[in-house]
Amino acid sequence: MSDERIRQIAFYGKGGIGKSTTSQNTLAAMAEMGKRILIVGCDPKADSTRLILHCKAQTTVLHLAAEKGAVEDLELEEVVINGFRNIRCVESGGPEPGVGCAGRGIITAINFLEENGAYQDLDFVSYDVLGDVVCGGFAMPIREGKAQEIYIVTSGEMMAMFAANNISRGILKYAHSGGVRLGGLICNSRKTDREWDLISELARRISTQMIHFVPRDNIVQHAELRRMTVNEYAPDSNQANEYRTLATKIIDNEFMAVPTPLEMDELEELLIEFGILESDEQVKQLTETDKAAKESEKKQEDAEGEA
């Protein structure tokens, strides 16, 4: 199979939103349908493959390279581990917080995988990426034209929506140079008021779709405690069928958009309209977070310009 036919997708979302859980359950469902999948974990926590491999955390490329002396000394079989339904799994890894560039592991891992033929005979490559904003090394799958379809995991909570809007801003930045597109928002429900309507409206306003609404179900946590996906732990459950539905929607998805992220006042208006943003303190929190995010993006742009 040629590289041109491989669909390269990425899951982004606010920390703690359930991005890795949602992506692994969805990819497990896709594998059940016969799709050949490689997961590339792009989070220093190395938790992007644990439900597929039934382990606490897969040993990362950077850790293995440090043990061997250099990434060039590694064999592909040491890095890529097969899990549930023969899903191939890799964790890029990263340094301790505050020490070095966490995105460097992503760059190192992807280059190693490409050079050693890891992308052969695949239908999907999935990048599970840390970050409330798309910047630095964490933008690498987008910036370098690796991931072509982005799915943002969000919910009806204020900061999750703020992060989704920020991520769409990052996608827009690279849309014309790298060809990346937003495939849709995945609402990982937190059972907030009018959540379905709110995320559907957010999706409409940023020119995308809510590709699926994943209901909240305790069976997800029960499966996680056993380090399993719901599809493996309870294959006949309603929740497993929800992930199968989402998997089918992604497989069939042809709605790839260049997003139109909201300005801060537009996002505030939406949140006020749905009763999410009520107090002056909440408005202040959102404004300060937006300012910090933009300052972070500006610093990264300056650093990229100097590189």
Swiss-Prot record:
UniProt function note: The key enzymatic reactions in nitrogen fixation are catalyzed by the nitrogenase complex, which has 2 components: the iron protein and the molybdenum-iron protein.
Molecular function GO terms recorded: 4 iron, 4 sulfur cluster binding; ATP binding; metal ion binding; nitrogenase activity
Protein name: Nitrogenase iron protein 2
Gene responsible for this protein: nifH2
Family: Belongs to the NifH/BchL/ChlL family.
Quaternary assembly: Homodimer.
List of residues binding [4Fe-4S] cluster: 101, 135
One Pfam family in the UniProt entry: Fer4_NifH
Annotated organism of origin: Mastigocladus laminosus (Fischerella sp.)
Enzyme Commission code: 1.18.6.1
Residues with the ADP-ribosylarginine modification: 104
Cofactor descriptive note: Binds 1 [4Fe-4S] cluster per dimer.
Residues that coordinate or bind ATP: 13-20
GO biological process terms on file: nitrogen fixation
